[in-house]
Amino acid sequence: MCGINGIVSFHASAPPIDADELTRTREAMRSRGPDAAGTWLSPDRRVGFGHRRLSIIDVSERANQPMVSREGDAVLTFNGEIYNYAALREELEREGERFDTTSDTEVVLRMYRKRGAAMLPQLRGMFAFAIWDARTSTLFLARDPYGIKPLYYANDGKTFRFASQVKAILAGGGVSTSRDPAGIIGFLLRGHVPEPFTIYEAIRELPAGSSMVVTRDGPSAPRSYFSLATVLRDAVNARRRYSDGERAEIIARAVRESVRYHLVSDVPVGAFLSAGRDSGTIVALATETGIPLQTVTLRFEEYAGTHKDEAPLAAVAAREYGTIHQTQTLSAEMFRRSLPHALEAMDQPSLDGINSYFVCKAAAELGWKVALSGTGGDELFGGYSTFRIIPRVLRTFGLFRHLPTVAKAFTRMQPRMARNRARFSPKTAYTLKYCTSYEGAYLMKRGLFLPDDVSSVVGEEMAREGLQRLGIMELIREAITPDPGTPFTRVAALESSLFLRSQLLRDIDWASMAHSLEVRVPLVDAFLLREVAPAVISMAGRNGKELLAAAPKQPLPAAILERKKSGFTVPLRDWLSHDRDVTKQFGGRPWALYVLDAGGHFAVAR
């Protein structure tokens, strides 16, 4: 895992690159790569790359970046890991390619020179990278299918800048810091800033599963090479049928293979362990490979003796699979002391991520460089309540479209219900307005504020401009375009393309990189998705998490299998008891406003 950045002065009237800006941007990402730093400038100073390295595969200096091809005609700055790089390297060697390192970075560079953008679907891993191709005077950028690794860019019409973090681009000093109403409104609606927006007008995020090029004419529009909705639609259309045994075998084999790939490393790999099925399955499958595995669990004093305390069951799983286990306890005082750093590391405002920040901190304090996480299991195997609730809501409220008298009566009641917050939740008044489509029902279920509410937070003018620029319903609809085909696959596409991508994965990235830790997610893998999607879809509404938990040869402890799902939460209400505005009516909304007001570089004056 690393931090990458670069500048391209593509327009003839643009000044040569300021090497100091390149360095400032790079050094703003020091925690992403404490092991090495590098800079490359083209002879005409029209192109420059920076890199901060966290050494995981081929830890020698010869694998440092930016990496220049043997021919001198291509330069790469790369962030992430390619788990199948060894097989790809063997394939290239059979075609006559020679290598100077044993790194996955060089495999990407050699593949690009040979195959160009056509290589992207062959890369199994998490990545964001940029390649300067001197043969065509073109900058090529790409991001992994799920967007596990971030990539932000800014274009002022003459100069193109990119980096792994928003705050790194800002640190360079070459872009405007004007806030983007769309990014702010997006955060208030969703609890995160929806891709491709950021909190700044000048900075955008390259969408997951896409690439783009920058030529002398400037940047092209991002081009998608992976569509999750398409993969799910194709799996539905295949109409495959399986016996229970066949289905279980397919899922077990595919998940086991993904875990094996995610263990590829030249440094030790650990794993986060909770009381849930996802992390337990990952740990069980990792230990099947025979490696000595360290695990860590985060516990909170406030949860001791309650259902939310995951430490006791995590310890049971650790004993079951023979891991070297540590339990780290987080107190309110430790939280308050670390909160300013957490908010500064956040990069973009997020409703979540504090839990990830502290478990990554615990792993880093144990000396880890790489950790496995069970993130992604709920989206892939239907573990969230949204898989049941959203189709049910649509069936119920969809009837109102055919009952105009009832619909009109409900519509007339909306203003009164919205004002009477003592009797009605903020969302209740707008149920009929939104719950007649998948995008509307998803916004109601996962949303923080609703479009009708945000003016009370930021004022009428910003709300109007932000909503217009954001187009939240169209943004959500894109996640299920093309139509994945069934209620299950529509919700899976929504959860994976929105909540997982722009919330969970982004939070894992900033939280882990703040502690120079690489977090890998074996259940978030495009190769795995293609393998298991037909089998999961064929379950006809049953919970796929049961088959995920059945994947290990040595079953998960019965207490974990029987435990009611609770999610990985932190006791924020107790920790922020000193702040009456937050705790007086605690929930997602007050915490979101706290983050927006108290955040680091992105703090917004309201």
Predicted regions and their residues:
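Cysteine-centered catalytic environments shared across enzyme families
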Residues: 1-347, 356, 553-563, 586-606
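Adenosyl-5′-phosphate
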Residues: 1-4, 10, 23-24, 43, ...
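Residues that scaffold the ATP/ADP-binding catalytic core of kinase and kinase-like folds
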Residues: 91, 172, 380-383, 531-532
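Active-site adenylate/phosphate-handling loop in enzymes that bind or generate adenylated species
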Residues: 145, 157, 358-421, 443, ...
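Conserved S/T- and glycine-rich ATP-binding loop of Class I adenylate-forming
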Residues: 273, 374, 500
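Short low-complexity, flexible loop/linker segments enriched in glycine and/or proline
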Residues: 340-344, 386-389, 575-577
